[in-house]
């Protein structure tokens, strides 16, 4: 069987990315143009600005991915592209480019769910990994606990009922005037703080639920900060960061490992931007070790948005006959099992 070459495109939020893969798991190139510096002054991603930046960057990024992989357009077997969830304008830039290219080259177009892309990042790093297993997907827009039954076959066990975990990090960072994105900033501060200094609440919800909730925790931290400011008392940002982070990662880890044990698996994977959080990696690894469970996660470059993960997911869709025609449209609220 000859090698299958995938060109993948990702533009769901504020990264313009393109990647070339061989047989789904071998990354030949992975180019990412980030807009963090552009959006930092706004304290978050501005959708219109993000879309314009994608338009400026996408052709350059795709060409660089092809050049680095040392392949031409005629070597590509199919194109994988994110079509949701995400910012609709941003999604349309990547999707329109991919559709035009697939049409011109007369090769298959494969639409990829961004969340499915995140969990697929682990296939790239861990060559021996295959379904079934449990995965925890945690990012600025998503917090999902998913049973991966097979390639492309999933059951959502739990998800956030309000804020995503990464969204909570950004909001607390903004409340302390620390900057954007909040996740890495709080993670770094937490390393020098006392995680037991402030007892913030943990929301475990119903006993049999795998769902998450971070709005109560967020409100508790905001109330703590406001109370300190009203009394003109010192706020030790390192302790706030460490205590807040501990409250988040404790719930994420506990629920994830409960799902692994309840379902009878011995492997859990992490993915998404928050999977790069050192506190989460340490906590879930510690709890997993005590229960004989193996934890796998991608390198940092594959945790945040990238096209390699989209290409991996797209490859498995492609070999399973899941392709799309030119009517494929952006779906900003796409669910993982749609």
From Swiss-Prot:
Catalyzed reactions per annotation: L-threonylcarbamoyladenylate + adenosine(37) in tRNA = N(6)-L-threonylcarbamoyladenosine(37) in tRNA + AMP + H(+)
- Entry EC number(s): 2.3.1.234
Which UniProt keywords are given for this protein, alphabetically ordered? Acyltransferase, Cytoplasm, Iron, Metal-binding, Transferase, tRNA processing
Residues at which substrate binds: 137-141, 170, 183, 187, 277
Classification via Pfam families = TsaD
A Gene Ontology molecular function term for this protein is: iron ion binding
Which cofactors, if any, are listed as required?
Answer: Fe(2+)
* Record function comment: Required for the formation of a threonylcarbamoyl group on adenosine at position 37 (t(6)A37) in tRNAs that read codons beginning with adenine. Is involved in the transfer of the threonylcarbamoyl moiety of threonylcarbamoyl-AMP (TC-AMP) to the N6 group of A37, together with TsaE and TsaB. TsaD likely plays a direct catalytic role in this reaction.
Family affiliation: Belongs to the KAE1 / TsaD family.
Name under which the protein is recorded = tRNA N6-adenosine threonylcarbamoyltransferase
Which organism does this record belong to? Clostridioides difficile (strain 630) (Peptoclostridium difficile)
Q: Which gene encodes it?
A: tsaD
